[in-house]
Amino acid sequence: MRWLLSTDPSLIQFLLRWTLAIVIFPHGAQKALGWFGGNGFKGTLAYFNKSFPAPLGLLAIAAEFLGPIGLAIGLLTRVAAFGIACVMIVAVLTTHTKHGFFMNWYGNQKGEGFEFHLLALGIAVALILGGAGLWSVDALLAP
């Protein structure tokens, strides 16, 4: 438990934490609430259930919706980052690798590549290793 909450008072970790939270939250809100043109909870879970058991779909939605909230306040940062990292790995392996590296910037691919996911994964791993950084609930709770 000590390692889970421990962190250095790092501005870099704080910036990484907020960057990942800001970028991932809209994706989670699409899945959980139907915001930003998303399918909402039921629609997303039905889509995920075509390929994965319902509990895994539920975990993915939670990771993308609750994870960024945890990151924003620095609560259980390593757990939130791990959940997001898992979602990024699964997305790359199941969906995006076949479309190559690049995002579909020009609309001439049949799908999105995995460059975004690789960036998010790198930030998540940095948070798993380094913790929440400055201005975090984790730092307040750490023994």
Give each language-model segment a name:
Residues 1-37, 46, 51-62, 66-143:
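Extended, low-polarity transmembrane helix blocks
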